[in-house]
Amino acid sequence: MLAIAALGIVAGRAQTPPPQSHVRAVTITILSTNLAEEGRGEWGFAALVEADGHKILFDTGTYPDTVLSNALEMKIDLSGISQVVLSHSDDDHTGGLLNLRRELSKANTAALSRAYVAKGFFYERMASPNEKAEDRIALLKAEYKRTGGTFLENDRPVALYPGIWLLGPIPRIHPEQNWSGSGKVKTPRGLAEDNIPEDTSLVLDTDRGLIVLSGCCHAGIINTIEYAREKVRSAPIYAAIGGFHLMRASDATLDWTAQKLKEFGLSNFIGAHCTGIEPVYRIRQKAGLSRRTCIVGGVGDRFSMEKGIIAGLLTH
């Protein structure tokens, strides 16, 4: 049985959930991404996860009010959600956190009061070894604490609910190199290239296979899926949803990625945010998917166990 652990940064440890079981009902709704048929688009990502009566907000978009505005337009009430997952520390995934916490807590003091991140989220960043470290994340941590929020930093996979896993830091077995910057990060071992070591993904274990939800997948989609299959369950990939940072990938890299996804039994793919547009179409072709099972994700697009991909006119 996989060990379950979470390191509380502000207070306490994550509670050990009941024994693992398959998630039976899942709906994932995109609340922030580049394309929008309804609501507002932005360079960022956020999604609402609803699974067996539980709700989790995954990432919070770039601008303070985008996710809240889009949710209101879609008549989605986020105030009942206490758990938020931040896939990594970039501001296009964390930018909405404070405003969401402040606004939603007016209706429910527990709204978005527990933020899950992976180890490395709070590492100091700098553009070069001689420059002063950025304080953006330190400020975010302090401001979130002032709202009554708690950060929970995980150094390994943790079950948030039965069958719903946050992977923690993901080993970089394949050289996918899915990051853009040339900055540096201060780690316990010293100054290193900032390859976004805290990048993490959410995994839902269903009886049809695993659903993988990523913000940017800086660890690499194949590294992420292989780690999920190792630590959660060696099962087919029922769906991969989110940003996968393939926008600059070569055709050879995309073909390799698509072949691996095909080997993993990928059934559904929604590539949003930094995935790019052409990469989605190439994966559709090379992985043997269709217009119904592989789309460029837009604001308001959904995936459910019952109906599969529910796309708007823009992304269908």
Protein language model features and the residues they cover:
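Active-site metal-binding motif and surrounding structural segment of the metallo-beta-lactamase
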Residues: 65-117, 230-241
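Metallo-beta-lactamase
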Residues: 120-200, 295-306, 312
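Active-site-proximal loop/helix segments of hydrolase catalytic cores
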Residues: 178-181, 187-236, 242-245
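Conserved beta-strand hairpin/beta-sheet module of binuclear metal-dependent hydrolase folds
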Residues: 27-74, 195, 199-214
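Binuclear metal-ion centers of metallo-dependent hydrolases, dominated by the metallo-beta-lactamase
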Residues: 148-153, 260-316
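Bacterial N-terminal signal peptides
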Residues: 1-8
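Pre-active-site segment of Zn-dependent metallo-hydrolases
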Residues: 38-40, 54-83, 106, 178, ...
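Active-site neighborhood of phospho(di)ester-bond hydrolases with catalytic His/Asp-centered motifs
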Residues: 57-61, 82-89, 116-118, 212-216, ...
